[in-house]
From Swiss-Prot:
It comes from Drosophila melanogaster. This is Matrix metalloproteinase-2. Its EC number is 3.4.24.-. Widely expressed during embryogenesis including in the mesoderm, developing gut, central and peripheral nervous systems and imaginal disks. In the embryonic nervous system, expressed in neurons and glia. In third instar larvae, strongly expressed in the morphogenetic furrow of eye imaginal disks and in the optic lobe region of the brain. Expressed in posterior follicle cells in all mature stage 14 follicles but not in earlier follicles and is also expressed in some anterior follicle cells that help form dorsal eggshell structures. SUPFAM superfamilies: Hemopexin-like domain, Metalloproteases ('zincins'), catalytic domain, PGBD-like. The gene is Mmp2.
Amino acid sequence: MFSKYVLATLLALFAQSMCIQELSLPPEGSHSTAATRSKKAKTAISEDIMYNYLMQFDYLPKSDLETGALRTEDQLKEAIRSLQSFGNITVTGEIDSATARLIQKPRCGVGDRRSADSFSPDNLYHEIGSNVRVRRFALQGPKWSRTDLTWSMVNRSMPDASKVERMVQTALDVWANHSKLTFREVYSDQADIQILFARRAHGDGYKFDGPGQVLAHAFYPGEGRGGDAHFDADETWNFDGESDDSHGTNFLNVALHELGHSLGLAHSAIPDAVMFPWYQNNEVAGNLPDDDRYGIQQLYGTKEKTWGPYKPQTTTTTTTTTTMRAMIYRADKPAYWPWNNPSNNPNNDRNRARERQEEERRRQEKERRRQEEERRHQEEERRRQVEERQRQEEERWRQEQERQEEENRRRKIEHKSQWERNPSKERNRPRERQEMERRRQEQERQEQERQEQEDRRRERERDRQLEWERRNRNGAREPVTPTANTTPRPTNKPYPTVHRQHHHHNKPRKPKPDSCMTYYDAISIIRGELFIFRGPYLWRIGTSGLYNGYPTEIRRHWSALPENLTKVDAVYENKQRQIVFFIGREYYVFNSVMLAPGFPKPLASLGLPPTLTHIDASFVWGHNNRTYMTSGTLYWRIDDYTGQVELDYPRDMSIWSGVGYNIDAAFQYLDGKTYFFKNLGYWEFNDDRMKVAHARAKLSARRWMQCARSANEVDDEQRWTASLVSEGEETGRSGSRELRINHFILSILLLAIANWRS
């Protein structure tokens, strides 16, 4: 009995010791079977993830994708060591926790292997005999053959496009400030560097993986897609330059890194470098770390001269040997020799003054960029407000159209129901239709006659006004005496809108218009000077006033215009500094005074209606710097890059409140304000309120021709007040006459009633 109890106790103690052995950590060098199985299972899972990561970023060749399981363990460990060395973590060759954290960090999508080969221990920073450090940055592939590069943004319709453009320009400025590179934004698909936001597979063979890990990738300099930078649109980006990652990944830091690839730099193993492949939210503040600065200067040179060591050169003569030193220029990090730097000479203040001037210039440049950025923000806000107002106006117009259509449908239904209730009228329907058509034609004829009479009345009124202005200006010195062969006065539209090449050898020249008594066909700022067009003549006004010898014929400046030119409809200078003339159904484009090849062209080539006979005015609106054209009651906006009318035009001129229809001319003056002209007056336009600044037109001759007021001329306000007074007096006189007549009639009625009663 006792032996059985002892045996059971020993078995229990043995089982307990085995459990304790299983739960305890194995000693160093031990190989527990269970622990080995667990480690191998974990390593198999980690190796699968690690294989994909190492192949994606060039630590293992991509050609072995299908035979990856046949690699040796030594190859995998060597690749892991390269990754750990490049990532600046402890090199173990094992998939430890630090390595797992490293491969989970967001990073650039460009591979590391090609640049990792350059980072062997004997190529790191170390001191050599000449006390010069060897560069650690990596150069990859070709570089750009020139230093003036262009860039453009593909996704211009994305919500934060303006912020992206600003950040990209800031990143490019950082690279430009430390090299001889210059960057210019263009609106073309042929730019050297194209910025693209895309998702997943986007056609270049390097698809994105959604939010996290791969943030972007870029291509090294070259043709085609060379230099292009692509960013993952699924990422949460912070376009405000904030250092707090809670609002998203700092786009400025990522763009600075990717554009380094676009310029020819590969990845760097220095953690503080911009070209470190893993994302880190470091504040650059306009300065590059030394590693990146040496790399970009090795490729494209530096803006300023650096001081390096003297290289000894020996010159031998017949009697003595003299050692001479020459200064050489080094593109990488130079050695510093205080006695060779003239800025350390206390007697030399010129270098210090130059440094102060350079520092002041940089400060002013920074302030200028800040002001430019602020102005751009304000311009965007103003443009947004204008577009919102236009959208509301379009919505109101659309609702009005729908209401009218609904009203027309309702009337048709009521009319149809009336015919259905009274079938006997069906027989008279053709006759009524004919009668309605006859009435419509009669109304059109009467309306046309009324319009012609109104036009003739306006022409006579304008002629009388011009004659009155001439008499008040000249007084009794130049009396107007009509003769039998007097040339008829010009009418409101004295010149045809369609110009043809006819040769009138005996055609008399038109008299020069009076500068102070005429209206304007067109007006524009050309090369910073004011040009006013009337008939075949023009005035040219500079900073000192009207040039001598003007007005002169337009064809003396632009001889390629039609020989029988009688007037121009509109003129403006476009953003390419070309001068555009609109004459009838055609338009001409001049490079200075030379006609551009292929011109003239019809107005329809701009996307305008083929039935349009002329343009009233063309101008660049200072509010949004866009080009507009008007004709009659409509206006259009032109896309300056495609040269075509934008899709949602034309629109009604009533949007320009107070301007009215059928204007004569319009332009943007040097003060940035827009002015509209009609007859002898003009209006200044208030861009913020979208209406004219003054309801009554001001005389054009006083403002633009500096014409003085004559002694006999009556002020506009006095004339307006006098007209009101005269109307009031006339009303009072007519009222008193009516009162006397009424009293007389009342007396007669009373007498008649008295006689009838008697």
